Regions:
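Short, surface-exposed loop and linker segments with low hydrophobicity and enrichment for Pro/Ser/Thr
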Residues: 9, 39, 48-53, 118-125
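Low-complexity intrinsically disordered segments
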Residues: 26-27, 91-160
Length: 160
């Protein structure tokens, strides 16, 4: 009996950690793609505010697996994702930023797969470029999506 309680606690702790990994994502909407009695598969739209650049929000759409495993955070979501980043306010930098930096990441399975959003600076065009891709412990996915946010003329991108 005590052993079963420990297993339940472990599963709940892992599920809580998986849910907490997407703390910066704000779900904007979703559509069901496959009905299941225990929760449908969906395409979700999430917003991520760039933590180093005020006034820039990235919108990521990706598949999320339903069912019991999906509800517990144990399902492996497909690696496909699309990204669109936009200027949503006055662009202001909180400090110098790296030439290239992994600015967001969210687990797509309980242990193995992570969705990344990387920001790169195109100094020549005064533009922030955002790339999304997924990886896993053994191999990543070549599927990716890219978007760019031009920074207004006169605003210098402070690069470390």
């Amino acid at each position: 009996m005590k052993r079963n309680c420990n297993r339940i606690r472990t599963v709940l702790a892992v599920a809580c950690l998986a849910a907490a990994s997407g703390a910066y994502a704000e779900e904007i909407g979703s559509v069901s793609t496959n009905f299941r009695m225990t929760g449908s598969d969906k395409v979700v739209i999430e917003a991520y505010d760039d933590p180093q650049v005020d006034g820039v929000t990235c919108y990521v759409s990706r598949a999320r697996t339903g069912g019991i495993k999906g509800q517990l955070g144990m399902a492996e979501d497909p690696p496909e994702a699309s990204i669109a980043c936009r200027q949503v306010g006055t662009i202001a930098f909180k400090g110098p930023i790296r030439q290239q930096d992994n600015v967001f990441s969210e687990r797509m399975s309980i242990l193995f797969k992570v969705l990344h959003v990387v920001r790169a600076v195109d100094r020549k065009r005064n533009t922030l470029v955002y790339l999304t891709y997924s990886d896993r412990i053994v191999s990543g996915s070549p599927q990716n999506s890219v978007t760019a946010v031009p920074v207004p003329a006169g605003t210098v991108i402070p690069v470390k």
